């Protein structure tokens, strides 16, 4: 075999590896505004969220017509918060907005703020453990209607799994 014949497969492998790395480098930072918009889209593709939260959960909106979930990576700081807005539409709990924080005043009886370290979000997104364990051991901190959250543990777990379904760069903090 000639040197040229041996070098072609190596060159092809190097190009393929470079393409994979370039794709990973283009992922938006986990919990950035752009990542949250993609998480909103993924919410709407997840029946356990759209259907199972369409009754009592979504109706508890404080009369404003939507619920807010703000989230951030603790190690990136509270200033990196993003927002999901969930609205009742056509009998479903649909994410109608994902991006930068727009709701300044939250209602703690209706809305949620959740934060965890990047490592913990990644673990929850992989399904290493669910919301009960995450909250019991302080791996997920949240403010909001705790009793309501306890009543929707199945959908809550699916929400945490969104973190693993939406590609995000965990090495960079959102700007």
Language-model regions, residue ranges each:
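Signals and flexible motifs at protein termini associated with secretion
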Residues: 4, 22-26
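Feature captures hydrophobic
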Residues: 27-175
């Amino acid at each position: 075999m000639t040197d040229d014949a041996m070098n072609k497969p190596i060159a092809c492998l190097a190009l393929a590896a470079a393409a994979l790395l370039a794709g990973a480098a283009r992922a938006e930072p986990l919990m950035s505004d752009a990542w949250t918009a993609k998480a909103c889209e993924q919410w709407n593709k997840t029946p356990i969220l759209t259907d199972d939260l369409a009754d009592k959960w979504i109706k508890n909106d404080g009369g404003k017509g939507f619920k807010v979930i703000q989230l951030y990576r603790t190690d990136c700081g509270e200033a990196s918060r993003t927002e999901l807005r969930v609205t009742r539409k056509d009998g479903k709990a649909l994410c109608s907005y994902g991006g930068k924080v727009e709701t300044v005043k939250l209602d703690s009886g209706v809305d949620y703020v959740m934060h965890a370290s990047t490592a913990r979000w990644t673990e929850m997104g992989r399904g290493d453990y669910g919301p009960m364990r995450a909250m019991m051991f302080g791996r997920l901190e949240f403010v909001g209607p705790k009793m309501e959250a306890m009543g929707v543990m199945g959908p809550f777990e699916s929400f945490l799994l969104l973190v693993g379904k939406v590609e995000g760069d965990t090495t960079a903090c959102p700007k």
